[in-house]
């Protein structure tokens, strides 16, 4: 988002450790506004092993315990509500690590709607009840299949059928389904569009989903219609 000329405002949790301090320093150096709260859990760290310009394996360092107690949850929500008047759009990036629970997601979606702010969600898992009434969700094909309970093949008709069911079930405004080499499909009640890719030699797919979400957020925040 920063690279696209936006001024992001980050609200999240950090471990009180070296990696957490490094992230704070990076945000400060880049001038990224943030409210980052320290917890007793270590900062989740991902190490990518690269060979011949391609990712070979990724090592994740984290704990399995819930990182969000009631006090921290309230701090997080209060921070989001303070940030809302200063932003044009809200992105919930859910990595399934315990921060984006049902309460947090629903309160953020509700508070954003109350101020007329669109909410984009990069989802994780099959519990989409917590994303109810979001503006747009960006699942990949595997995630679409899992949440719909259907074995969805990478074909326009099957993707649209599954997406239509999900839109109605969770009262969503739209879905943007990423489809690897077949591009993306945008599905909303009144309009749908399949967007093909242009062939490129891919060296590293890391962050492809994040790039889609960031570009979408920047465009919508600038008032560009889908």
Model-derived regions, located:
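Conserved N-terminal subdomain of the carbohydrate kinase-like
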Residues: 2-91, 103
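Generic beta-strand/beta-sheet core signal
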Residues: 11-13, 50, 92-95, 122-124, ...
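Short, charged, surface-exposed secondary-structure boundary motifs
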Residues: 44-46, 68, 146-149, 202-206
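Glycine-centered loop/turn positions within well-structured domains
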Residues: 54-57, 182, 193, 214
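Short glycine-enriched, charge-decorated loop/helix-capping segments at active-site entrances
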Residues: 62-65, 149-153, 200
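Conserved phosphate/ATP/ADP-binding segment of small-molecule kinases
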Residues: 97-192
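Conserved post-catalytic alpha-helical subdomain immediately downstream of the catalytic base
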Residues: 169, 173, 198-226
